[in-house]
From Swiss-Prot:
Gene3D superfamilies: Formyl transferase, C-terminal domain (3.10.25.10), Formyl transferase, N-terminal domain (3.40.50.170)
Family of this protein: Belongs to the Fmt family.
Designated name of the protein: Methionyl-tRNA formyltransferase
Function in brief: Attaches a formyl group to the free amino group of methionyl-tRNA(fMet). The formyl group appears to play a dual role in the initiator identity of N-formylmethionyl-tRNA by promoting its recognition by IF2 and preventing the misappropriation of this tRNA by the elongation apparatus.
GO CC annotation: cytosol
Protein source organism: Leptospira borgpetersenii serovar Hardjo-bovis (strain JB197)
Catalysis performed (reactions): L-methionyl-tRNA(fMet) + (6R)-10-formyltetrahydrofolate = N-formyl-L-methionyl-tRNA(fMet) + (6S)-5,6,7,8-tetrahydrofolate + H(+)
PANTHER family per record: METHIONYL-TRNA FORMYLTRANSFERASE, METHIONYL-TRNA FORMYLTRANSFERASE, MITOCHONDRIAL
Amino acid sequence: MKIGYFGTPEHSAKLLKALIDSTLAEVLFVVTNPDRPKGRNKKTEAGPVKKTALEHHIPVFQYESIKREKEKALSDFGSFPADLYVVFAYGSILPKEVYECPPLSSINLHGSLLPDLRGASPVQTALWKGYSASGITIQYIGEKMDEGDILLSQKIDIIPEDNTETLMNKITDAGTESILRLLKAYDGKPFPAIPQNHAKATYCGKIKSEDRILDWSLGAEELHNRIRALYPDAIATTRFREKRIGILKTKLSSLSIESNPEPGKLKRLDKKGLLTQCGDGRFLEILELQPENKNRMSASDFLNGFRIQEGETFG
């Protein structure tokens, strides 16, 4: 099957590579976001999907706004008679004229069990809300975001140690396997699909900068879920000795709940462990953190370097 591929980040590049390597598909062209400045030097750099495409000599198209530039895009794609467009984390909404262009239309890999968690942050939101399971959905692209008919879906278990990085790995693996299975089953007819139950739809928005700031008056489990939802793309932060510090990895402590909690209070756990008290009286064990202008470090390295004093707090 001849495919046009739309995607941008690392996980999308993994799916692209699987399609390139498969005998089931021929990737005719790739559409990805424009190159952006990255790193401390702000050097303009191609994204992972573009790099993968160029390594395999596949034509690449980039648009600042595919909605505003749809006529150019349609002209560009006209030289490549794709049967199907596959979309995974492209970063922009496709105009109707684009997604209806190929004979088999366009499909999207979404990181939740639709109609639950339609929107921009399904993976982060599933973790933030403390879900024990989520999944993937392959859907036709329609006029409204994530409301298209469903071709395939698969449940994925979430463990307490998962964060956005590990859950995205699971989603990418499951989504890749599902799309390859779909292509293998193709019999020359349009892919069968079922409508979503719109009455059961839930939604999630983009992560905001203020979402990163930890409020230690909240409960320990809620804070733990927020920290793992934000890692690694938007690190959770707090304040310590008038400087910002990133909290990268935590776990819930089994220490006894205190009836008169002091939210943000720091407590040593033997010589290597660091605990922070939360608003519900429970403690959150800090496993990895990153002080401002320093490299990430373990809790034991933080304790050795900063000499925590009795009564000091995060917040």
